[in-house]
Amino acid sequence: MAELKFKTKAQNLKNLQTKLKKAKVLPLVLTSLEELISNEDKVLQDIQTLKANRLIIRSSSLSEDSMKNSNAGAFLSLANIKADSKDELLKALYEVANSMPSKSDEILVQPMLENITLCGVGFSVDKDNFSPYFCLQYDENGSNSSITDGSSKSAKTYYHYRNYLEFKDIRLQKIIELIKELEVLYDCHFLDVEFAFAIQDDKEELFCLQVRPLVMHEKNNLFHSLPKEALYRFYKRFESLKESRSRVLGDKAIFGVMPDWNPAEIIGLRPKRLAFSLYKEIITDNIWAYQRDNYGYRDLRSHPLIHSFLGIPYVDVRLSFNSFIPKKLDENIAQKLVNFYLDKLNKNHELHDKIEFNIVYSCYDFNSSKKLEELLNHGFNENEIKRLEFSLLELTNKIINPRSGFYLKDIQKAYKLKERYDGIINSNFSLIDKIYWLIEECKRYGTLPFAGVARAAFVAMQLLNSLVEIDFITKEEKDDFLNSLNTVSKNLSKQTNHLNFHNKDQFLKDFGHLRAGTYNILSPRYDEDFELYFDADQKDSKVYLQDKAFVFSKEKTRALNALLKEHGLEINACEFFDFLKQAIEGRELVKFEFTRLLSKAIVYIEELGKYYDIEKEDLAHLDIKSILNLYSSLYSINPKEQFIEEINRNKKEYELTQAIKLPSLLCNADEIFSFYNHSIIPNFITQKSITAFTAKENDKDLEGKIVLIYAADPGYDYLFTKNIAGLITCYGGANSHMAIRASELGMPAVIGVGEENFEKYLKAKKINIECESEQIFCL
């Protein structure tokens, strides 16, 4: 039985004054507008009994803090009111009173808490799905409101699994013990608690500033969906993965959701089983390592890049770092290098989506000598650095070779995809056989070459960027070159720019296979839901495209030839620009072509579901291997029964995936149970500023608005045809598709702001993006 029942904010605190053991409650006076009007002097006398210099006057309405509606922040609260100024005090009392709907609504008066050392808000569960974590957000800047009003610049967010009893910070332990005590007093596991630590009489004390129930209306309740046994199994698995595997160097295991093949961006943080298994099948289980090996890096075949940790996709970062080491580099230097990378990332978590730019040396460029100097401060001698530099140069020359560069063969392979595609879809194969061969051909002629061309394109961008770094070309010249390229996405933008009912069929023939979520069966193709993506009646879009040839002067060409020779790059200026163009355009071309096969395979999976009377929403939970196995294995059990049994099991597992909370970068096993959410540094595109209303991707009216989308997925390219003002993505790195496209189009965008910031921006009606100063303001 509960000792206390939830009432108003003021009544809750009043009742807690004599009950609460784990924290203090400040003295308080309750009044109302009715009482103020009838007996103003008595109210003022009562307030003087608080013996405070400054006061905080807060609303305490019956329509606040209930089980059905929190109305958080709906009514007025005024802080730092002088207790000895009658006029100021009365003015504040009436202002707070008049902000509430009823004359009988309470006004809560308390002393201002001084000498605050830590202040924040704690939830006893996740506020959105009630998963079993204590979620604390706090600030140590001395403010009593920086967390609640969103003004904090140094807020910390801490998650702690409810059944985990170990703590590293005594203050966080005390806050959680306070929340647990409140749970017992109110017999309620779903609480929102405001707290503060402050120095009183030379001692730091914990204060409970407010408690209210979390509103549960129409929310998914995952409170019982995460058994501790699952987390302890995960803990043991992580511990075992610390041991280095065959051919893998490095002393520390780190896993992340955004490095390298960036699953958070491509399939999301909590993908359903079909999307996750497709990504693993066609790229991250085997294909990725084959191409790194082919392109001159360490042979890591048979090592899967991505692990599923209770349904969340994590890249093995140590393995990834190994895969960027030239295979001819001395083993001892390679070992030191991997450990240097791991240590740098461990100390700079914000770089986890920028490892190829800010951590690893994966190719030679015009600024390599200067960049490699940092290794002198980390235990490398000049001889080791020179050997690394030479290895990178040798590898880069192999990649960019205009006659034998692997990327040229890979681009040619992609041209076979159309023939393979037509052969399969026009065959008399069963649905299962068609799915099998689409996936197989997608791997052989699609994702295998794509992994290679994507690597070549990265090398191309690194070389191009380094020309800017050494002031050989300007940033504007770099942008002019990129804008001169004839990419698939540029062609898509041109086509949609003039899209109408007359050319709609041809447009869908060319681009209809694209979908916003490339691997997601629940994301419709362009040709399945045209109206969702496009408006055939739209006027020509003001797309930021400038079609002009890039011209390099003869003098500049001669200088580039000399520069290439000076750096030992075995290519001339014309061949150099041909490489940049072919690699960057080729990356988009190969991806565009392989997604045609993948997208059709997903269509056939949907048809297979219809045949077996299984809904698309359920098919999203089916592992692709369960379908592929049926190509060469016949079982006594009917495939429908087999699928449904697995779907039900995976659905249950997915509840656990939704409930679990993990850091974006997992460096230590104990972070499985408790961790801080580290700050994320977003990627600002262009130097422009823009102020506009916000819109979500599915809103009908996007013109002139800043659009917010979760992933920087290429399928969202259609947004650029909607005359949008700007773009913000939750996930995505500096090298993501949308970052590149926004840069090409000169559109202000912020890529990869992180979950916490993204949720804040979703609530803003209007946003100001200042790309030059790298700031975002909610207006």
UniProtKB/Swiss-Prot annotation:
Active site (record annotation): 737
Q: Name one Pfam family in it.
A: PEP-utilizers
Q: Which UniProt keywords apply?
A: Capsule biogenesis/degradation, Kinase, Transferase
Phenotype of the disruptant? Mutant does not express the MeOPN CPS modification.
Annotated pathway, please? Answer: Capsule biogenesis; capsule polysaccharide biosynthesis
The record's listing under InterPro entries reads: ATP_grasp_subdomain_1 (IPR013815), PEP-util_enz_mobile_dom (IPR008279), PEP_Utilizing_Enz (IPR051549), Phosphohistidine_dom_sf (IPR036637)
Which reaction(s) does the protein catalyse, per the Swiss-Prot or TrEMBL entry?
A: L-glutamine + ATP + H2O = N(5)-phospho-L-glutamine + AMP + phosphate + 2 H(+)
What does the record give under GO molecular function?
ATP binding; kinase activity; phosphotransferase activity, nitrogenous group as acceptor
Q: What is its EC number?
A: 2.7.3.13
Q: List the disulfide bonds.
A: none
Question: Tell me, which GO biological process terms does this entry list?
Answer: capsule polysaccharide biosynthetic process
Q: What is known of its domains?
A: Contains an N-terminal ATP-grasp domain, a specialized central substrate-binding domain for L-glutamine and a C-terminal phospho-histidine domain.
Q: What else is known?
A: The reaction mechanism comprises three steps. First, a histidine residue of the enzyme attacks ATP at the beta-phosphoryl group to form AMP and a pyrophosphorylated enzyme intermediate. Next, the pyrophosphorylated enzyme intermediate is hydrolyzed to generate inorganic phosphate and a phosphorylated enzyme intermediate. Finally, the phosphorylated enzyme intermediate transfers the phosphate to the amide nitrogen of the acceptor substrate L-glutamine.
Biological function: Involved in the biosynthesis of the O-methyl phosphoramidate (MeOPN) group found on the capsular polysaccharide (CPS) of C.jejuni. Catalyzes the ATP-dependent phosphorylation of the amide nitrogen of L-glutamine to form L-glutamine phosphate, the first committed step in MeOPN biosynthesis. Also catalyzes the phosphorylation of D-glutamine, gamma-L-glutamyl hydroxamate, gamma-L-glutamyl-hydrazide and beta-L-aspartyl hydroxamate. Does not phosphorylate L-glutamate or L-asparagine. Does not act on L-glutamine derivatives with removed alpha-amino or alpha-carboxy groups.
What is the name listed in the Swiss-Prot or TrEMBL entry for this protein?
L-glutamine kinase
